[in-house]
């Protein structure tokens, strides 16, 4: 079992408990996690922590997918991963309609479809096998809508990303757990009782079966939040 520290998002006044974070690193904690709601963001504090630590992994729990394009998130993740020597972990989530539609002003619908599209695009960017194209329900690259200029073209990231960058997703439902098992490297399950892992295991198994290769729990991390 690994231990992580969740510092969350900031209240009205921004501060970062670096003494606590450095103590956790000294005690052998494996990770520290930032968060966001509708105030401070998750990526900037992660960069701040990475710059002041040496060994501990730093991740986002979570970055809201509807708030950023997949390409922008990939750019942020690649940059943090490279600057930190591979210590950054990208944690993503769909958030909820109150925040997505009320704060970001975009439609919330079909969050699991968004998750699969989002991660597929990010992994394509990290792999750099070809120029990125995508046509899905939520995302189209290059954009070809009725208001498009027609000047967009497929691109490949200038920065060489690392496909080893880990991607976690948040889940509050069996379908969400299945989605995580299929497309992610780890999951933040909500309301998890360690003694009742049997509740989660069937959904993860369905996701693993849909993934490429012989994916299983040995290739996956379950990271519940405890208080």
Q: What kind of region is each of these model predictions?
A:
Residues 9-11, 38, 64-66, 94-98, ...:
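Active-site-proximal loop/turn and secondary-structure-junction residues that shape catalytic pockets
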Residues 1-60, 165:
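N-terminal beta1-alpha1-beta2 module of alpha/beta enzyme domains
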Residues 3-7, 32-34, 58-61, 88-92, ...:
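Hydrophobic faces of well-ordered beta-strands that scaffold small-molecule active sites
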Residues 40-44, 66-71, 75, 98-101:
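Short active-site-adjacent helix-start/loop capping segments
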Residues 62-67, 109:
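The substrate-binding groove and active-site-proximal loops of carbohydrate-active enzymes
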Residues 74-186, 190-220:
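Internal, glycine-rich beta/alpha segment that forms the wall or movable "lid"
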Residues 15-19, 44, 71-75, 182, ...:
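Generic recognition of short, well-ordered alpha-helical segments
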């Amino acid at each position: 079992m690994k231990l992580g520290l969740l510092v969350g998002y900031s209240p009205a006044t921004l501060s970062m408990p670096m003494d606590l974070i450095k103590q956790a690193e000294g005690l052998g904690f494996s990770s520290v996690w930032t968060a966001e709601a509708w105030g401070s963001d998750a990526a900037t504090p992660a960069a701040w922590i990475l710059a002041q630590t040496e060994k501990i992994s730093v991740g986002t729990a979570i970055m809201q997918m509807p708030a950023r394009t997949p390409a922008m998130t990939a750019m942020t993740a690649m940059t943090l991963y490279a600057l930190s020597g591979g210590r950054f972990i990208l944690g993503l989530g769909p958030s909820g309609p109150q925040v997505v539609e009320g704060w970001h002003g975009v439609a919330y619908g079909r969050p699991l479809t968004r998750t699969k599209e989002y991660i597929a695009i990010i992994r394509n960017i990290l792999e750099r096998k070809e120029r990125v194209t995508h046509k899905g329900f939520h995302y189209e690259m290059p954009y070809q809508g009725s208001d498009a200029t027609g000047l967009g073209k497929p691109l490949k990231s200038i920065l060489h990303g690392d496909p080893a960058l880990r991607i976690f997703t948040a889940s509050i439902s069996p379908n969400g757990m299945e989605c995580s098992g299929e497309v992610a490297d780890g999951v933040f399950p909500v309301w998890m009782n360690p003694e009742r892992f049997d509740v989660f295991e069937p959904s993860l198994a369905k996701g693993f079966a849909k993934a490429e290769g012989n994916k299983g729990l040995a290739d996956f991390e379950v990271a519940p939040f405890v208080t």
